[in-house]
């Protein structure tokens, strides 16, 4: 059920999606190497900087090791769903007349946020440029003039592929509600999610959409979504958002998508156990995914970032679950549990999730060791970015308390 009410506030400050260009790929710097020599014809796709919004790409810049190459390079855009890559569009082949090439993509290429840019070497002349070492950047390389392929560790290259494209943005994921539910829990619990959206008084009506990322299923264009519109100065409330979206039965997370340049509304959520005689639960706020800083204190973990999450002080009275929500570049990380005295418990559990994937499981499954009194877990991200959350639940009342982890250290 959705309700609407007018609220009165003395002052409200809302965020705004900054008016910047749609971008994808690595900006140019002086390359010191080339891509791998997999074959005369090969395709490279940059993984770490997916399209930052939905829109159209009209210009691409890339480095080529030799000039004077005829019909040697194609610019390609791929869409990744899970570990499957499918060609969206390609332009070229382009004649190479300089090492640093800027080409017009005509007609412009429509892209979705998260799409990836790549280059195909289609003539035996010159090579795409790269920077070694790649630090936090990497790309995949496959043989041939590819139109589809599957991710595997064997195709990953550790260097920074030098290709970049720009264009016009139309909409963007403004933020993520980390965990939502409308499903049966343990011990007779039934968890639902109340979501509220407040539009600033000074703004025009705010319209957008919710996109549901279901547990264990890599996100993609076919994910369930629902539009919303909130008049200036009012609140719209959905007492069971996933039921309103027709997606009950599985937990997950929610993307809040807005038109490019729109003011970001205030978004709050409450995940609650609907017991029929009152509720228990926890509040969540929208975690912004635009204009955020890769820095200590953020809720978004990035390559080189570390942080910690508490388990319960009493492992008999409470249970603990750990949730991970990867963003557009996916994530590779290690969760390592520690005893209360600071000594390591086990060797750590490695995890890898493709883009826009939400998963939650028990402490034991996620860390590889049993839950115990006073335990805590260290998060270390090696590639990509993600949001991490721990849920501590009372075994008698099923009352959950969730905390979103923050970055406490980083190696950049």
What are the language-model segments listed below?
Residues 2, 74-76, 91, 209, ...:
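Context-gated lysine
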Residues 5-6, 21, 43, 80-81, ...:
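Positively charged, low-complexity intrinsically disordered regions
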Residues 1-21:
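Sec-dependent, cleavable N-terminal signal peptides
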Residues 7-10, 47, 84-85, 165, ...:
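Intrinsically disordered, low-complexity segments enriched in polar/charged small residues
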Residues 19-96, 100, 104-116, 120-184, ...:
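Beta-sheet-rich sandwich/jelly-roll-like modules and their strand-loop junctions
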Residues 168-412:
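Gly/Pro-rich, tryptophan- and cysteine-flecked surface segments typical
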